[in-house]
């Protein structure tokens, strides 16, 4: 079990990247990004101190707001903060819902950071492999390649 000190010294491999990683590491990228969103709040880091890749992923917060609406996001974030730590990824069916789901997961772990909950692994929200199907990986890679090139 990792300690808070271990979490504070966590290494984020993609945080400074300005381009998309390989297809094989896209699941690791999303997992790490969601964890990083909590980490920067828990340890009072500068959220803007990152590469273009993470900055592009942060825009998914806006997609989540448009997709779910701010009231629904606040409701989900509060429910997730009170013990219901699972998101049903089967509702992801297109690009917008994929990006909105990534955005809301980031907002949830960020909110946990404000509550001093050091949630160091994204798996507590659900199984990332459920979200990152081959089709969703392709959607995400193509979108990010287009944005970052």
From Swiss-Prot:
Q: Which family does it belong to?
A: Belongs to the orthopoxvirus OPG044 family.
State its location(s): Host cytoplasm
Please give one Pfam family short name.
Poxv_Bcl-2-like
A GO BP entry: symbiont-mediated suppression of host cytoplasmic pattern recognition receptor signaling pathway via inhibition of IRF3 activity
Described by its record, this protein's role is as follows: Virulence factor that affects the acute immune response to infection. Bcl-2-like protein which, through its interaction with the DEAD box RNA helicase DDX3X/DDX3, prevents TBK1/IKKepsilon-mediated IRF3 activation. Contributes to virulence by binding to the host TRAF6 and IRAK2 and preventing host NF-kappa-B activation.
The subunit structure is: Interacts with DDX3; this interaction inhibits DDX3 and suppresses DDX3-mediated IFN-beta promoter induction. Interacts with TRAF6 and IRAK2; these interactions suppress TLR-dependent NF-KappaB activation.
Arranged from A to Z, the UniProt key words for this protein are:
Host cytoplasm, Host-virus interaction, Inhibition of host innate immune response by virus, Inhibition of host NF-kappa-B by virus, Inhibition of host RLR pathway by virus, Viral immunoevasion
Q: Which InterPro entries match?
A: Orthopox_K7, Poxvirus_Bcl-2-like, Poxvirus_sf
Q: Does the keyword Protein transport apply?
A: no
Gene symbol? OPG044
State what induces this protein.
Expressed in the early phase of the viral replicative cycle.
From the Swiss-Prot or TrEMBL record, give the protein name. Answer: Protein K7
> Which top-level group of life is the source organism from?
Viruses
Gene Ontology CC terms: host cell cytoplasm
**First-listed, main subcellular location of the protein, grouped into a coarse class:** host cell
Question: GO MF terms on file?
Answer: protein sequestering activity
């Amino acid at each position: 079990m990792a300690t808070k000190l271990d979490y504070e010294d966590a290494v984020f491999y993609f945080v400074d990247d300005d381009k998309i990683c390989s297809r094989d590491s896209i699941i690791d990228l999303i997992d790490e990004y969601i964890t990083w969103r909590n980490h920067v709040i828990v340890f009072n880091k500068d959220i803007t101190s990152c590469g273009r890749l993470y900055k592009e992923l942060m825009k998914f917060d806006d997609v989540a707001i448009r997709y779910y609406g701010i009231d629904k996001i606040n409701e989900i974030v509060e429910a997730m903060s009170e013990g219901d730590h699972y998101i049903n990824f089967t509702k992801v069916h297109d690009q917008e819902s994929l990006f909105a789901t990534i955005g809301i997961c980031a907002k949830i772990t960020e909110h946990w950071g404000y509550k001093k909950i050091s949630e160091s692994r994204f798996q507590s929200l659900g199984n990332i492999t459920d979200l990152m199907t081959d089709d969703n990986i392709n959607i995400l890679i193509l979108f990010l390649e287009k944005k970052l090139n």
